[in-house]
Regions:
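Surface-exposed patches in mature extracellular/periplasmic domains of secreted proteins
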Residues: 1, 14-18, 88-99
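Alpha-helical scaffolds flanking conserved acidic
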Residues: 1-3, 100-107
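Peptidoglycan-targeting cell-wall enzymes and recognition modules
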Residues: 1-82
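Extracellular cell-wall/glycan-interacting regions and their flexible linkers
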Residues: 28-30, 55, 72, 89, ...
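A residue-level signal for beta-strand positions that form part of recognition/binding surfaces
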Residues: 41, 89, 107
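Long, well-ordered alpha/beta core segments of mature domains
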Residues: 62-66, 73, 90-96, 100
Length: 154
């Protein structure tokens, strides 16, 4: 998830809007899925995906697609969408579980094989940077977060 968020936000780790350096008029003219263009940590696109995310997280993203830029909504879309397979039907557990970590394959959760090796390298760097010891605050935070998302205590 961290590798995906890093990549999809143009390395900012902040929710961004697709082609944020261009005007909204440009997006309206050039993006066939406007106004449901890429937003957030994962670049949620297409009306059907906005409808699905809206129903799942309880935020009206159809009436106001820009709400996908709100950090809380963007985080929920990233996490629940990747775990639940909202984007392509592929889920995080299809590639990462207690026995294996396939960051290259995991790109299929969001966007096929597009830049999979580059994003996998980023994810690997994040994984290596997180301390492994049981006393680590990061490990405890991740385990608590994972438990909330999956409903399983760690």
């Amino acid at each position: 998830m961290l590798g995906t968020a890093y990549w999809e936000t143009n390395r900012t780790m902040l929710p961004v809007e697709e082609a944020y350096w261009l005007s909204d008029a440009w997006r309206e003219k050039n993006l066939r899925y406007y106004p449901w263009h890429g937003r957030g940590f994962v670049q949620l696109t297409w009306k059907a995906n906005y409808q699905k995310a809206s129903a799942k997280i309880g935020v009206d993203l159809i009436g106001d697609p820009s709400r996908a830029m709100e950090p809380d909504a963007a985080a929920q879309i990233l996490v629940h969408g990747m775990i639940g397979g909202w984007f392509t039907g592929k889920k995080l557990a299809d590639y990462i579980d207690g026995a294996r970590v396939d960051f290259v394959g995991a790109r299929a959760i969001v966007n096929g094989k597009d830049k999979a090796a580059e994003i996998a390298a980023i994810a690997t760097a994040y994984l290596a940077a997180l301390p492994e010891d049981q006393g680590s605050i990061w490990l405890r935070i991740f385990k608590a977060f994972w438990g909330i998302i999956t409903g399983k205590k760690q």
